[in-house]
């Protein structure tokens, strides 16, 4: 893992801007708990979170499932996000709602579909955590993972402080102490994330009260930058729903998914234009 200098990121702007919902597709009931979104070979990939089948689903750009891939040998304890690089897909099995889990991991799978695939596990823990008793306001839950340079970066969902701590991991299998490299004062709890290396653009989804969800956009994001970041906040105009995944297309275009909130609704795939 590359040596990373500690930095603290401070929120210096939280202006709420307008945006437009350009496309809105209903997803199959199979994807009621969709919790990650990436693009591989011109298809979306997504997965369900806690307790569902250990499967990656491939969708077209209207949300229709066209393929699925079972991740044999692994359970879906709480798969919360996806990240990709040129060779691999990374599945974030790191949901930890009440700070009780001791089996956090990132599952590493090849991008290319092959019946002889072998999957690897990047197991980790937070060295700052010593108390694994049930906590309603958890500090070591996490739902956002990005691939950046030769590293994986975790954004925690700190309910107690309404911040996001940043932890870095290598991309190689093994057992690790995740290294804290900073904190992002989101003033909300982070539920998903994506990073575009060509644009140096970071996008996070977050919520304050679970009734409203937001996109947090940070430009010129880098592991080596120590300056304060300006965070632009955009309310997602879709009403009461649960948003846990985002994919950057360009500086102004994003796709998100939302979970099914009731028996009369369905999960959704949406395109948003700033």
Regions found by a protein language model. Name each.
Residues 1-22:
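Bacterial Sec-dependent N-terminal signal peptides
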Residues 19-274:
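Sequence/structural signature of beta-propeller domains
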